């Protein structure tokens, strides 16, 4: 419930500000947007970090749009059509992600604690949004290096995911050996090494077969569903969503 409430208010804030930019009432500059909309009703339910990153994301989306539009005017052949301005967020399909910075993140007794606004604390009678971290997660993430946490809903499965962004030191490569990978289909990959006579072929036929099964089954179920409701009202069923997830994760 807490996550859905946060998602609702950050999505609504995103849409309100996006509408004002579309109408020419505001320029997509983060500092100006934050100054004007920080007292919006929806902001009462969002921690300052949630609000700020919602507006930063929108400003960045508009910046990318204008960059693409300028490039389109110079190189129209690179595009299938005129770039479109940032779309609105819909709670049932693409709700806005909820972002917490390191200043709103704490680790205590193996739990990830995310700061909430006073309004949310009072509404849900909690001090923070808490997630228990498994030993496995704690083993490969340096908790002191966490920079950001995102809560995002995946469109195919409609599941919510916790995304932890952290700094990690890159190990220096002391060797000069080189590996060459040649992707294929029947042979998924052919691998050779500069300083070795060993070569490897990875069989891709099982993967092709499994992928073909998923595609065929998804097409069959989609055809049945379209006959039931019509193509205009067609939506992925739970079974089709499950198959898409299985195909992606296979």
Residue locations for each model-derived region?
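Nucleic-acid substrate recognition interfaces
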Residues: 1-250
């Amino acid at each position: 419930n807490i996550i859905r409430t946060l998602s609702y208010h950050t999505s609504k804030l995103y849409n309100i500000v996006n509408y004002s930019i579309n109408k020419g009432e505001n320029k997509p500059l983060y500092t100006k947007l934050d100054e004007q909309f920080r007292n919006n009703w929806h902001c009462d339910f969002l921690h300052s970090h949630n609000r700020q990153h919602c507006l930063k994301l929108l400003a960045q989306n508009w910046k990318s749009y204008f960059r693409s539009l300028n490039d389109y005017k110079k190189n129209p052949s690179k595009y299938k059509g005129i770039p479109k301005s940032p779309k609105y967020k819909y709670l049932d399909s693409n709700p806005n992600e909820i972002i917490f910075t390191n200043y709103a993140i704490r680790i205590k007794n193996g739990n990830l604690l995310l700061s909430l606004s006073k309004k949310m604390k009072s509404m849900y009678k909690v001090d923070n949004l808490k997630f228990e971290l498994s030993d496995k997660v704690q083993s490969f993430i340096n908790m002191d290096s966490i920079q950001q946490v995102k809560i995002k809903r995946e469109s195919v499965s409609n599941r919510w995911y916790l995304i932890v962004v952290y700094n990690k030191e890159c190990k220096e490569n002391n060797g000069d050996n080189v590996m060459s990978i040649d992707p294929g289909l029947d042979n998924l990959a052919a691998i050779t090494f500069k300083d070795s006579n060993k070569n490897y072929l990875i069989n891709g036929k099982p993967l092709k077969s499994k992928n073909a099964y998923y595609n065929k089954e998804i097409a069959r179920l989609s055809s049945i569903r379209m006959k039931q409701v019509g193509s205009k009202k067609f939506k992925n069923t739970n079974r089709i969503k499950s198959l898409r997830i299985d195909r992606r994760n296979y």
